[in-house]
Amino acid sequence: MKAEKRAKLRFDSKAAYLPPDDASKSINPPIFMSSSFQYDADIYQQVVDGERKSVNIYGRCGNPSEYLFEEQMMVIEGADACLATASGMAAISVSLLGLLKAGDHVVCDWTTYSSTHEMLDHRYTDYDIETTFVDTANPDAVRDALRPNTKVIYFESIANPTMKVAAIEPLVDIARDHGAILICDNTFASPYVLRPLEWGVDIVVESASKFIGGHSDAIGGAICMKTDRLPEDFLEQIRWNTMVKLGSPLAPFNAWLLLRGIQTLAVRLQRQCQSAASLARHLEAHPKVNKVWYPGLESHPQHEIAKKQMPEFGGMLTFEVDTADAALKVLDNLELCSFAASLGAVRTTTQIPASMAFLDVPEEQRREMNIADGMIRISTGLEDANDLIADFDQALSLI
């Protein structure tokens, strides 16, 4: 199928279709399990001339399996370019380090994944890169935080773990007026639910370990971009100047697993979105539950924004019980659902953000992020929604 025709397909078809392998005509992609590739005179000359992406050199620089994953990510994100990385945090680190230098400033949402927050709030200050944390759901707060040296505005499409949804269009306008690059972490939504590049975002980062892979068996990340504001070869510059130097390429077998995951992304997310909505409605009416955060609920503060930006509301939700001890008792007594880290897979997983993912974030900062000690995060899987509801009911009955 020609690229122009494939571009007109609906999302489900784009995700499921992979062109056959040129050499074998296999409809499934091969795995190139090699760290080294043989040169000849022509390949040597291409390398000398700087045409490094068109040839295979060394596994840390790239691999044909990795390139196949990058091409498929471009298709489902609506991107002009993609760079695969070893993890979602590698995607975030590589994209930021590729854009920033000493003396630069970042405006970041105050509710972001804990490792992102810690990296910007602590590690980057060692290199004279400052960050101001604000509520990106409030465009005025973002605008007020800008400085002459602000190079990046960073936010999550659906915030981890509070499920906050920022309006993208005002952030795009602010970034363009200021000359800053707008980066969106789209992990909680996935490209099935939201494609931020279509809304004008400059760079999208994904933890492909989550919904994209979808089976809790592979770690990987992706940086996707449009070329209307950034140079066409921007990600290739980052590949060679940053990613290769940090040593964070995507492994070939993980690339193959993630390619397989993309093919079922649409059908998995359809079920996960439906189950999350059913579970959110049920928990909102439960007497032991203080509050539920899910963009599909009318009670969600940004419900109207979510309706505008997303055809469905994702497979993630959060709810709150009275105390951390109560939260632990609920999760420790779940039978069908897993009490485990990570998200976006075929099994429903749960965690207590305050004492797990955000454990290293000081309590005062967690309160500013609206992360309560009794907050429970749920990533819905492919189980029947009625069975999920029954499992939470029996666990909640014990507190």
Predicted regions: what is each one?
Residues 39-90, 115-122:
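Conserved N-terminal alpha-helix of the aminotransferase class I/II PLP-enzyme fold
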Residues 20, 33-39, 188, 210, ...:
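Glycine-rich beta-alpha junction loops
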Residues 1-53:
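N-terminal glycine-rich, Lys/His-bearing helix-loop that initiates the first secondary-structure elements
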Residues 54, 80, 219, 254, ...:
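Short amphipathic alpha-helical segments
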Residues 289-376, 380:
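Conserved C-terminal alpha-helix-loop-beta "cap" of PLP-dependent enzymes
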Residues 76, 283-287, 334:
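Acidic-histidine catalytic/liganding microenvironments
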Residues 2-6, 12-20, 82-288, 293, ...:
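Conserved PLP-enzyme active-site core in the AAT-like
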Residues 1, 121-122, 130, 144, ...:
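PLP-dependent enzyme catalytic core of the Aspartate aminotransferase-like
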